[in-house]
């Protein structure tokens, strides 16, 4: 279920302060965040984020196509363990 349009998109206030400080200083240092629920705003385009996936931080470079999505969508929390196949099929 999506958020009500009357409320508007959510962004962590501390994250917005960090983004504004980075824009003002023209720095390219990645912004480390645990806020996976924050919506990507147009101000974020061109910035690097390190989004926590529960175990480590994943580098996310924000492009224009990502606007409106959540930061957590680009930092996968689960790794896919590939199913093993028969060894006889691999030998052929």
From Swiss-Prot:
The keyword Nuclease does not apply. GO terms for biological process: ribosomal small subunit assembly; translation. One of its GO terms (molecular function) is structural constituent of ribosome. GO terms for cellular component: cytoplasm; small ribosomal subunit. Transmembrane segments: none annotated. It holds the Pfam family Ribosomal_S19. It comes from the Bacteria. The keyword Ribonucleoprotein applies. Keywords: Ribonucleoprotein, Ribosomal protein, RNA-binding, rRNA-binding. PANTHER family: RIBOSOMAL PROTEIN S19P FAMILY MEMBER (PTHR11880), SMALL RIBOSOMAL SUBUNIT PROTEIN US19M (PTHR11880:SF8). Protein S19 forms a complex with S13 that binds strongly to the 16S ribosomal RNA. Belongs to the universal ribosomal protein uS19 family. HAMAP family: Ribosomal_uS19 (MF_00531). This is Small ribosomal subunit protein uS19.
């Amino acid at each position: 279920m999506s958020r009500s349009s009357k409320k508007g998109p959510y962004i962590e206030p501390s994250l917005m302060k960090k983004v504004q400080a980075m824009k003002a200083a023209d720095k390219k240092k990645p912004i480390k965040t645990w806020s996976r629920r924050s919506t990507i705003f147009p101000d974020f385009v061109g910035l690097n984020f390190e989004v926590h996936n529960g175990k480590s931080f994943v580098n996310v470079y924000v492009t224009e196509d990502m606007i409106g999505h959540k930061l957590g969508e680009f930092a996968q929390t689960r790794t896919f363990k590939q199913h093993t196949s028969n060894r006889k099929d691999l030998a052929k």
